[in-house]
Amino acid sequence: MIYEWELEKVKDWTLNEIRNRIWAAVNCGQPVPGNVSVEALRMELVKRGEEPIGYHNT
């Protein structure tokens, strides 16, 4: 479940920040800063026109 506050928090992050934080959460088990879910990060990528491919689908 994605909360509105998560999307508000990540809207100012760069694409590279979002990708790196997804990678760190999925591959290294590190929490995303601010307790944001990986699903919210994926949704933000889609909103920006990015295809959530590769490790983003994990």
Question: Can you say where each PLM-predicted feature lies in the sequence?
Answer:
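N-terminal acidic leader/helix
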Residues: M1-P31, G54-Y55
